Amino acid sequence: MADYSTKAVWVGGHRGELKCSNGAVVPFSAPAELHGEADVLTPEDAFVGSLNSCFMLMFIWAVERLKIDLESYECEAVGSVQEYLDRTSTFSEITMSPKIVARDCSERDIQRALELAEKYSLIWQSITAEVTLSPEIKILK
């Protein structure tokens, strides 16, 4: 079993630094509308971004395994927050919209790589929000 650790250190105001077990140090803040600062990673962006980046890495792994000639990949992920009467909130849905360009393969090959990426994405398998995948696939000959 693998363990991952981080350390959050307050640096003043509504800012902090996230020190990761791999040595990365990432500044973060509350969202600007919640007394935070603009242009700094927020916990909400990190949550959606962790799914997006993990899914992409697993997709790349699947593409390599299936020997797909990938030309490009980019994915926009949007997390929708549900707010409740008691002022609590949760991510209720995350929509993933990958744009994939590949060469000399079938759309079914890409769909299989997407299925494998979903199955083996640690973050996808760990969250309770509904995840919707809406890929745009282009095959070049």
Give the label of every model feature segment.
Residues 57:
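Active-site-adjacent loop/helix segments that line or gate small-molecule/cofactor pockets in enzymes
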Residues 1-49, 60-141:
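Extended beta-strand/beta-hairpin segments
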Residues 54:
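Alpha-helical metal-binding/catalytic segments enriched in His/Glu/Asp
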